[in-house]
C-alpha cells in the first residue's frame, strides 16, 4: 500500500534528521526540466506543498503574464530542507514538515544551503538567477554569486505584496528576454524526468 508519512515537527527535527538528509542527498540526482533555464529562488510558505499557498499562487499569476515564463525554474528556500525545486514539493518530507519560517539563518544552515546549491549544479543547468526570497534574499544572492552565476536580487522585503509582484514581473521580463524559448511539452517531459531521477 501507499507509504503513510507523519508530519515532522520542529521539536523532533534537526538538520540531521534521516528524512532530511535523504532528501538533501538525492538532490544530486535531480536535474531541472530543461537546459538554459533561469533559476528563480522564492521563499517557502507555511502551507505545503508551497504551490498551493496563497503567496505562491500570487507569484504564479504574476509570472504567467511574462513571455517565456516556462523557462523560469522555481526553487523554494527553506530550513531544514534547504532548496526544494517545484517538482519535488510533493516528495517526502517536503510536504510533511511544520516549522516556523524566520528568515534568520545560522552558520550551519548557511553551510547547508551552500551545499544544496552546489548539488543543484547551477553553472551546468541555469543561465541566470533571480532571487525573490524576502528575508532570505541577501544570503541566497551571495551563495549564487559564489558559484559565478549572473544573479539579480529583487530586493523586496514583502515578496508577495502588490509592489513585490510588480518588481518580480519586470525583472523576470528583462531576464528572460534573451533566454531560449521553452514550450509546454518539453517542460512537462523534463519535469517528469527530473522527478523520476530524484525518486529512483
Stretches with model-predicted labels:
Residues 110-190, 194:
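Glycine/proline-rich loop-helix segments at beta-alpha junctions forming the active-site rim
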